Amino acid sequence: MQICLMDETGATDGALSVLAARWGLEHDEDNPMALVMTPQHLELRKRDEPKLGGIFVDFVGGAMAHRRKFGGGRGEAVAKAVGIKGDYLPDVVDATAGLGRDAFVLASVGCRVRMLERNPVVAALLDDGLTRGYADADIGGWLQERLQLIHASSLTALTDITPRPQVVYLDPMFPHRQKSALVKKEMRVFQSLVGPDLDADGLLEPARQLATKRVVVKRPDYAPPLADVATPNAIVTKGHRFDIYAGTPLTE
């Protein structure tokens, strides 16, 4: 994959070349998207809209830390949707990990989550965030136990994952309404990189085959159900819907 690669660390240790080789990235000087190594973290920038700033994954501070400390925890819609109840903390595969926010919420309340991400740039951002998170004195211990990254296409990986999870979580990128308020700056940068999930409909069936209990699909409230498969089971929040589908129980 081609992207502009930049190193702002001041180091001459070749870390950028190692990063490019690991994730299969090629430097393209003219690409409007840039992956930048800063002294603090790895970040994604949209060079033709510098005011949008850089996007990076931070499990330790910022919004994630606030959500972990002061958010709804088990009461969050995503936690309810995957079925957390009492001692039941399902094993989850997040097949469209993105920047890892929902996966982190589930891990923070006790679920083991395997994140799948097919875009190599996004996977690199997630890996950088996990590396810093694993090293953190406060959350590193449980984060290493509960949150892991698999860099693979969900369409292929969903048929190969073992052991099978109880829940598969899907949050495919959906085209935003043109008339809606300006999409959050982060989403604009993100969508410029990955675009809409045009093959997302193909995820539902393999997800249902993989999950032993349920599949949860997060959708904007105006979006049709994934693959046009309606379900009466959903948790509805302001602006979103968590559609719930039955999985395929384990056979004895």
UniProtKB/Swiss-Prot annotation:
NCBIfam families: PRK10742.1 (NF008012). The lineage of its organism: Bacteria, Pseudomonadati, Pseudomonadota, Gammaproteobacteria, Enterobacterales. S-adenosyl-L-methionine binds at R101, D102, E117, R118, S153, S154, D171. Its main location: cytoplasm. Belongs to the methyltransferase superfamily. RsmJ family. One of its GO terms (molecular function) is 16S rRNA (guanine(1516)-N(2))-methyltransferase activity. This is Ribosomal RNA small subunit methyltransferase J. It comes from Salmonella typhimurium (strain LT2 / SGSC1412 / ATCC 700720). The keyword Isomerase does not apply.
